[in-house]
From Swiss-Prot:
Keywords: Cell cycle, Cell division, Septation. Belongs to the MinC family. This is Probable septum site-determining protein MinC. InterPro entries: CAP/MinC_C (IPR016098), MinC (IPR013033), MinC_C_sf (IPR036145), MinC_N_1 (IPR055219), Septum_form_inhib_MinC_C (IPR005526). One of its GO terms (biological process) is cell morphogenesis. Cell division inhibitor that blocks the formation of polar Z ring septums. Rapidly oscillates between the poles of the cell to destabilize FtsZ filaments that have formed before they mature into polar Z rings. Prevents FtsZ polymerization. Transmembrane segments: none annotated. The keyword Cell division applies. Interacts with MinD and FtsZ.
Amino acid sequence: MTRGKSFVTIKGTKDGLTFLLDDRCSFDELIKELTDKLSANYYKSGEEERPVYVKMDLGNRYLNEEDKAQLEAVVTEGRNMRIEHYDSGVISWEEAQLMKEHAQTTTLTRMIRSGQVVHVKGNVLLVGDINPGGLLTATGSIYVMGALKGRAHAGFEGKRDARICAAMMAPAGLQIADESLYFVDKDEAVEDHMKAAFLDEVNGSIRIERVQRLLDVAAEINKEAVS
């Protein structure tokens, strides 16, 4: 008796291929059907050809690192394919805890003085100042409702879309993820309106703009990235 429903559906997109994987069958059944489908000559390619990027749509299936390695071995064997992204409706408990930490915002009411280093998981709202010689780091974004005259490091664990905002932006240095910006003349950054620092991924550097301009700037960056 033949099985009517396919466990693997392959769709072409402008960016590559999307593999829709059934989340109700066993993982072994999934691997077997994927191996059978990819054995067709249509999917074979040489290393000299441009790689085909693959998005894996897992539905409500969770894969550990060992499962992903097995899946990647099937996809890449004998063909120039690269798994670019896994899209799953479920996550592990550890991933959920990490997302919770990054999403939460901690409010601090204090001054960060010279020589002090304060580290926060997630976003942080500081009601106070960061004095010269002080350092505030966060895995998320940093919002200073006061003067930022010391240093601030947002996206401490690599979050590149983190931001640093301050009511008075006059820092000695800013860092977002692994990108840094230092100031020789801090007075030139002092203005009456709140400013925000963020990563411009087009040129890979930190930009500082008025908070009111963030939406316009984001649209400009997206337009440049597409063109």
